[in-house]
Amino acid sequence: MASFKIVIVCLALLVAVACARRRDMMSDDELDFHLSKRGIPCACDSDGPDIRSASLSGIVWMGSCPSGWKKCKSYYSIVADCCNQ
């Protein structure tokens, strides 16, 4: 059992080292642009009540909306908000 734990710890360290590779840093504006383009679309209240015909003008942000964005859904969620610029 002890050798199994050692193997698990070694694998965890290997994954941690592999994930800790150097990444290029982006400015906040560039990061916001890239995140907004890769985000999950959501329907704002202004898009209408029917989700099938809505234009999905919002983007789902985890946590809360970043600066320059506003919450566009009337309901409250702890996990994510539907935001648009």
Curated annotation (Swiss-Prot):
Report the superkingdom from the record.
Answer: Eukaryota
Compartment list: Secreted
* Gene Ontology molecular function terms on file: sodium channel regulator activity; toxin activity
Residues of the propeptide region, as annotated, are 21-36
Tissue expr: Expressed in ectodermal glands and in clumps outside of the extodermal layer. Is not expressed in nematocytes. In adult female tissues, shows similar expression levels in mesenteries (gametes-producing tissue), tentacles, pharynx and physa.
InterPro entries referenced in this protein's UniProt entry, alphabetically: Myo_ane_neurotoxin_sf (IPR023355)
Q: Where does this protein chiefly localize?
A: secreted
Coiled-coil stretches noted in the UniProt entry, renumbered to this chain: none
- Cleaved signal peptide residues: 1-20
- Pfam families to which the protein is assigned, alphabetical: Toxin_4 (PF00706)
Question: Keywords for this entry?
Answer: Cleavage on pair of basic residues, Disulfide bond, Ion channel impairing toxin, Neurotoxin, Secreted, Signal, Toxin, Voltage-gated sodium channel impairing toxin
The record's disulfide annotation reads C42-C82, C44-C72, C65-C83
Quick one: a GO cellular component term?
extracellular region
The family note in this entry says: Belongs to the sea anemone sodium channel inhibitory toxin family. Type II subfamily.
Biological function: Binds to site 3 of voltage-gated sodium channels and inhibits the inactivation process. Is highly active on DmNav1/TipE (drosophila) and is only extremely weakly active on rat Nav1.4-beta-1/SCN4A-SCN1B, and on human Nav1.5-beta-1/SCN5A-beta-1. This reveals high specificity for arthropod over mammalian channels. In vivo, when released into the medium, this recombinant toxin induces impaired swimming, paralysis and death of the crustacean A.nauplii within several hours. Also causes paralysis of cherry shrimps immediately after injection at very low doses.
**Miscellaneous:** Nv1 toxin seems to be encoded by 8 different genes. 4 of them code for identical precursors, whereas 4 others code for very similar precursors. In the genome draft, 6 additional loci are also correlated to Nv1 toxin, but they are not predicted to be functional genes. This high similarity may be explained by concerted evolution. The primary structure of the mature peptide is identical in 9 entries (AC B1NWS4, AC B1NWS1, AC B1NWR6, AC P0CH90, AC P0CH46, AC B1NWS8, AC A7SCE5, AC B1NWR7 and AC P0CH45). Additional information can be found in entry AC B1NWS4.
Q: What is this protein called?
A: N.vectensis toxin 1 3
Please tell me the species this chain comes from.
Nematostella vectensis
Q: What is the lineage of its organism?
A: Eukaryota, Metazoa, Cnidaria, Anthozoa, Hexacorallia
